C-alpha cells in the first residue's frame, strides 16, 4: 500500500493537501461524469466503426459517433488540465499523472489525425482505421487512469486504516 507502514518506499499518489483539494473541487465531479460518458461514446462508436468496416454501411453514423467521442476527449482533456492545476498546481504533467498525460497526447494526436482525414476527404476506410488506432490508444490510456483511480482508493483505505489504528492505539 502506498506510503503505508507496510511499504514506506512507495510514494503516495496524493499528499493530504492534494487529496483535500481533489475532494473539494467541482472539477473532480466533472471528470467523474465525463469519463464514463466518453467510454459509452467509445463503445457505441467502436461498434459503428467496425460495422462500417465489415459491411460498408453506416458511414455517417460512424462518423458522427467519432466526432462525438473526439469532442468528449477534447473536453475531458481541457477539464482534466484544469483539475490538475487545482489539485497539483500545474496544468499538465504533474508527477502523479505524468505518463498518463504523455499518453493522452498520443490519444489526442490520433483523434486529431482522424479529423484531418475527415476534413481533407481521405478515403473512408483510412478514416475508420485511424479512428480504430485512436481508440486502441484510448483504451490503454483509460486503463492508466483506472489504475490511478485504484491506487487512490487503496491510498485512501490505507490512510483510513492508519487513522483507525492510531485512534484505537490512543484509547
From Swiss-Prot:
GO terms for biological process: bacteriochlorophyll biosynthetic process; light-independent bacteriochlorophyll biosynthetic process; photosynthesis, dark reaction. NCBIfam families: BchF. It is an enzyme of class 4 (lyase). Keywords: Bacteriochlorophyll biosynthesis, Chlorophyll biosynthesis, Lyase, Photosynthesis. The gene is bchF. The keyword ATP-binding does not apply. It comes from Rhodobacter capsulatus (strain ATCC BAA-309 / NBRC 16581 / SB1003). GO terms for molecular function: hydro-lyase activity. Pathway: Porphyrin-containing compound metabolism; bacteriochlorophyll biosynthesis (light-independent). Pfam families: BCHF (PF07284). Its EC number is 4.2.1.-. This is 2-vinyl bacteriochlorophyllide hydratase. The keyword Lyase applies.
Amino acid at each position: 500500500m502506498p506510503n503505508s507502514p507496510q511499504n514506506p518506499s512507495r510514494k503516495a499518489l496524493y499528499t493530504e493537501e492534494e487529496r483535500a483539494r481533489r475532494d473539494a473541487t467541482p472539477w473532480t465531479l466533472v471528470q467523474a461524469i465525463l469519463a464514463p460518458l466518453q467510454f459509452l461514446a467509445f463503445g457505441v462508436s467502436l461498434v459503428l466503426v467496425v460495422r462500417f468496416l465489415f459491411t460498408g454501411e453506416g458511414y455517417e453514423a460512424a462518423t458522427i459517433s467519432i466526432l462525438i467521442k473526439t469532442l468528449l476527449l477534447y473536453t475531458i482533456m481541457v477539464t482534466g488540465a484544469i483539475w490538475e492545476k487545482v489539485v497539483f498546481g500545474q496544468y499538465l504533467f504533474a508527477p502523479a499523472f505524468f505518463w498518463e498525460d504523455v499518453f493522452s497526447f498520443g490519444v489526442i494526436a490520433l483523434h486529431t489525425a482522424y479529423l484531418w482525414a475527415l476534413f481533407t476527404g481521405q478515403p473512408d476506410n483510412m478514416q475508420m482505421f485511424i479512428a480504430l488506432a485512436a481508440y486502441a490508444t484510448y483504451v490503454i490510456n483509460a486503463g492508466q487512469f483506472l489504475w490511478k483511480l485504484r491506487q487512490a482508493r487503496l491510498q485512501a483505505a490505507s490512510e483510513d486504516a492508519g487513522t483507525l489504528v492510531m485512534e484505537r492505539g490512543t484509547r
